[in-house]
Amino acid sequence: MKLALLGRQALMGAMAVVLMAGVSVKTFAAENLLNQVKERGTLRVGLEGTYPPFSFQGDDGKLTGFEVEFANELAKHLGVKADLKPTKWDGMLASLDSKRIDVVINQVTISDERKKKYDFSTPYTISGVQALVKKGNEGAIKTAADLKGKKVGVGLGTNYEEWLRQNVQGVD
């Protein structure tokens, strides 16, 4: 009985060490990235640059929008300059994974799968699934099931594509 209790305590202690090691590694990685950003003097920010009002090219050809302003303020808070890196959505997370960018400031849906790999800020916008149909076609599509057999356009690799594949059979 004492041996079993001792074994459980050892197991719990080992689990605590493993959990703390995970936290320490994550904290170390974040501190390491922050040090790299400060040494470099720039925060490399991935954003699409094609999505008004969040990030887009203004009349002067420069990136502008809410996410651009947010990126500049974040960099200023860190004592560095923002290096804006317009990136197509289908390559955004790969750019983060390969360390071509330091942070993504872009409309990114938080999913359980993504939370396993990435840290997320508090959401600054909330969006849902919407549909747009041609004038005169309003009555033909009222529910997701009405999309069956129809051609539907969604962004490649977006949560909308995932939702469509999971919720509508036979969509093209």
Task: Please report, for each region that a protein language model flagged, where it lies by residue.
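Secondary-structure junction motif
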Residues: 153-168
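C-terminal segment of classical bacterial N-terminal signal peptides
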Residues: 17-28
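Extracytoplasmic small-molecule ligand-binding "clamshell" domains
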Residues: 30-107
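Bacterial N-terminal signal peptides that target proteins for export
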Residues: 1-14
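Flexible hinge/capping segments at coil-to-helix
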Residues: 134-151
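Short, well-ordered beta-strand segments
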Residues: 44-48, 132, 151-154
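Ligand-binding "clamshell"
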Residues: 112-123, 169-172
